[in-house]
Structures are given as structure tokens and as C-alpha cells.
Amino acid sequence: MARTAFHDEFVDYYTILGAESTSSYVEIRQQYLKLVLRYHPDRNPGREAEVLPQFQLIQKAHEVLKDPKLRELFDQRRLLEAGRPDGVLRFRPKKSGPKNDISTKVASKVSVTMATKFAEKKKKQDRENVDSKDNNITNFSLHRSFSASGKMEKNNSFKEVSTSKSYISSGYLHPKTSPIFKKNGYATENVVDPISSSPRFKGPNYNKFNAKLYLESLREKRRTYTPLSEISNGLNSNGVENSSITKSSPRSSSSSNNERFKDTSEESIIFTSPNTPEHPSVYQTDITPEIKLEHSDNNSPSKPEIPFRHPTSKPLPPKPLSRSKSSSLSRNQTRSQLNDLSAENDSTSNSTEYDDQLQSILRSLAIEGDDDEVAKVLPKPPSVPTIQAPIPPEAPRNLTNASVDSYLNSFEMYQRRWSSYSIIYTQYAFQWQIFKNKCFQLDLMNTPGQSRLIDNWKEGSQAIQLFYAYEQMHLRALEELQSLKESLFASFGI
């Protein structure tokens, strides 16, 4: 019914029902019931043919105005129709599908005045775009190469204009000083401005493009002037900076990378001196600790061992290389064990201090969760009722004897259920107000159990708001019942 109501000729449904556009649905329904009783074919014997069109129009008006969405659409169309001098649609195609429906809505909502304004605004924007294109000069152009015969070649490419660094400033060219421009500021080559040829280079997108190119050139310079060998030589296997390894110069970095794995004989590995002030690391070969460990495992018993140092954040002092004296090894082992124990003691002391602070925080939070302390201070909230709210019946659309009788019987049952529901929730609302007054008198800054208080407050507030919503629904049901009674009395002349 909603489709036919909006695709026929425009009819003011407010005028048909005798209501205002600001009237509520209760007032509109009162007028509808009066008119239905007056123009019903059964109440007009002998005049059925005259009354039937008016009765159908009243029914259609009520179907549109009772639905909030349909009523909003009708109000919008009513405003559009009021603004036209003729008041009718000028474009009415055949109703052959959904496409025609869309075109009808679009064509009917655009007047001649609005179309003229749109055209003037579009022309003004085009003129501004043309002016802005003429003032923009860039350092990138789309070159189109031509052959000797004058025909354009197929290979059109986007090429960068070769200019010196002195003529480029912030990604733009100066027309007066650039070599590709003449004295009058025009280009010396057959170039096409990309701003006028493609919309991709308009506005801030083109500036971002130049900025990306500039940043990429800076990154390329950093890669060329900062070799990766310097970074790898200054870090150990765990990514921690090793102070015993010095960074080589850029000139010698390439040679060190090429000769890294050349000297891998046992003699070169065994007789490498430790990193001490007497033996600086400049004279060492560039061998990683992993390679030293792999070669040291294959050494013979007659040759001295090379101690392997685990990578740490702080480099340890070098240990003496001796196998004949077991006492020196035992002293080194005990010293390392003492260092490890001291480190563990420091960590345990720090952890105990942290645990003490954590325990103090947990004790302060435990006071809030103690049920006995909370029960002594906070008032007890009332329990929320579990009774369900009744739903009022809908008013009948057709005023027949059976529909009116069933509506009145169902409303009587609803009234009984509402009476018991309202009594229970009224008592709960009274107890809830007492609970709130007690909470208002508390010193909430020094009161434990605030989380429980917030939960109780949310639960009670939601229950009271739901009761008020059902109360408003009950009030609307009473208004509909009163309007139905008035329409029935008016139909019988009482």
C-alpha cells in the first residue's frame, strides 16, 4: 500500500483527515475514526458508489500517516509539491521497473531554479580550475616524442626533466633561472603540463609525490655513505654493542669483508691475542665468535685452548690461558661463581623490594573486597522485582462489533495485570529512594567497596528507568482507549 500511495497523483492526506501537519497520532486517529464512521458504505445505504472512493482515500491517508517513516517521506514530498507553481509532476515515465521509480523521484525533486543554480556554480568552479592550472609550473612533464615525419611515436613515457641542483628548490622549478625555460618563462621543449593532462597531479597529491622522491634520494645517500660492515662489526651475535671491536674505516671495510674467511687455519685462530689494552683489537682478523668456537672444538689436546666468552652487556676481563695449573682454573671458576651469586643476590633483593610494594598494594585492595567491612559501611540495596511488565493491546483498525469487543476484553485483562505490576514496582521505587538517600550521606572518599556500590547503583537505576518506560506505554494505551470511546459515542450520536 505504501508504494501506490506515493506513485499516484499527490493528495494532501492532512486535508483529507482534517488534521494539521503538527498533530500527534492520537489526534489523527480521532479524526480518522470519525470520518470512517461517517463515510462507511454500510452506514450509507443507497450511496455506496458515492461514498466508496472517499472511504478508500481515508483508509489510504491513515495507512501513510500512522507509520512514522512513511509520514516523514510524505512530509518531504508535501514540501516539494508546495514549492512548485503547478503542483504536479512534470516527468512521469512508464512504471516498468525499479529504474523508472528512481528516475521519477530524482526528476520530481529538482526544480528549474535549483538546476540553474547548480549550472552557475559548476561554471564558476571550472573557471577557477582553469586559472589554477595556468599558474602551476612543475619540474616533471609528460614528453611526447615525435618522429621526423611529424607523427607521434607509440612509446609515450613519463620522463624526468634533467636539471642541475642549483635550479631546484623544494621540488619546484624557478621559471626565470631554470635552463629549460626561456627568458619569457615558456618551456624550450614540446612538453605537456601533467596538471592539465591528468587529474592525478592536482592539489596536495603532487606535493606528496615530490616529497617521496626527495626522501628516497636521502635514503639512497645514507646507504652509500654508511656501509653495512660498520654496523655488523660493532654488534655481537645478540645485537649488543661490543666495545672490544672497533669500527673499521669505510675504505678498509670492503677489504675486510672480502678477507673475512680467508685466514681460517688453526694457527691463525689459536695465536690470536685477547682484547686487552696491551693487545688492541686493531691488529686482529675480523672473525666472529661463532667461527672461533667451531675451530676451537677441533683443536688437538697438545695445543692450548682459546676460552670462549659468552656475549654479555658488560664485557668481562680476559681469563688467563693455562691448562697445566688446575688451581688457577679452580680459582677462576670460584670467582665466576661468586660473581654469579652476587648478581643473583642483587636480583633477589630487587625482587623482594618489588614484592613488598606489590603486597602493600594488594592489601589496600583487599580491604575493598572484604565482605565484612563492606557490609558494615554500605547500606543494603533493595532486591529488584522479577515480575514481568504487561503489554497493552493494540486498538482495532476496523470498528466492527467483534473487534471492539475483543479489544475491550483484552484491555480489561491488561488493566488487572498492570495493577499488580505497578504496586510491586512502586514499593521498590520507594525503597530505592531510601537506599539512595543513605548513599548520599556516605563519605565516598574513605569508604571501601565502591565497586559494589557502583554495581548496585547501575542495577537499580536500570530497573527504575524500565518501570518509567512501561508507565509511559500504559499512558498511551489509556489515550487510545479514550479516543476509541469518543469516536464510538460520536458515531451513535451520544
Swiss-Prot record:
UniProt-annotated stretches for the region Disordered: 229-354
Single Gene Ontology MF annotation: unfolded protein binding
Principal location class: cytoplasm
Comp. bias intervals (Low complexity): 243-256, 321-331
Keyword Secreted: no
Subcellular localization: Cytoplasm, Cytoskeleton; Nucleus
Keywords, in A-Z order: Chaperone, Cytoplasm, Cytoskeleton, Microtubule, Nucleus
InterPro entries tied to this protein: Chaperone_stress_response (IPR051964), DnaJ_domain (IPR001623), DnaJ_domain_CS (IPR018253), J_dom_sf (IPR036869)
Pfam short name (any one): DnaJ
Keyword Nucleus set for record: yes
Subunit relationships: Interacts iwth ssa1.
Protein name: DnaJ-related protein rsp1
Annotated organism of origin: Schizosaccharomyces pombe (strain 972 / ATCC 24843) (Fission yeast)
Organism taxonomic ancestry: Eukaryota, Fungi, Dikarya, Ascomycota, Taphrinomycotina
